[in-house]
Amino acid sequence: MTKSELIEKLATRQSQMSAKEVESAIKEMLEQMAQTLEGGDRIEIRGFGSFSLHFRAPRTGRNPKTGTSVDLDGKYVPHFKPGKELRERVDAINA
């Protein structure tokens, strides 16, 4: 599901909000989440999951075109850990 598909689906389910209001709310929520992670903080949505930053240590990589070794710097990457409720709902699909 893309962001525009999510907005469309929510707009049809929320008759009290216009599609533009739903779009604005989604964009603002995503922006706030990005700013929170950018500040190094963790986001926890109970039952859904948590977003945090994980550090990837410096390593030696390989340029896929040339095959030469390339030193890669350490960096922080966004990480999502599903919550118990979400994990159980997804697991129920496989049962």
Curated annotation (Swiss-Prot):
Pfam families given in the database record: Bac_DNA_binding
Keyword Coiled coil part of the UniProt annotation: no
Cellular component per GO, a single term: cytosol
Keywords carried by this UniProt record: DNA recombination, DNA-binding, Transcription, Transcription regulation, Translation regulation
Superkingdom, taxonomy of origin: Bacteria
GO molecular function terms listed in the Swiss-Prot or TrEMBL record: DNA binding; structural constituent of chromatin
Region (Disordered): 56-76
GO biological process: DNA recombination; regulation of DNA-templated transcription; regulation of translation
Physiological role: This protein is one of the two subunits of integration host factor, a specific DNA-binding protein that functions in genetic recombination as well as in transcriptional and translational control.
Listed NCBIfam families: hip, PRK00199.1
Annotated family: Belongs to the bacterial histone-like protein family.
Quaternary data: Heterodimer of an alpha and a beta chain.
The name this protein goes by in its record: Integration host factor subunit beta
Organism of origin: Shewanella sediminis (strain HAW-EB3)
Gene: ihfB
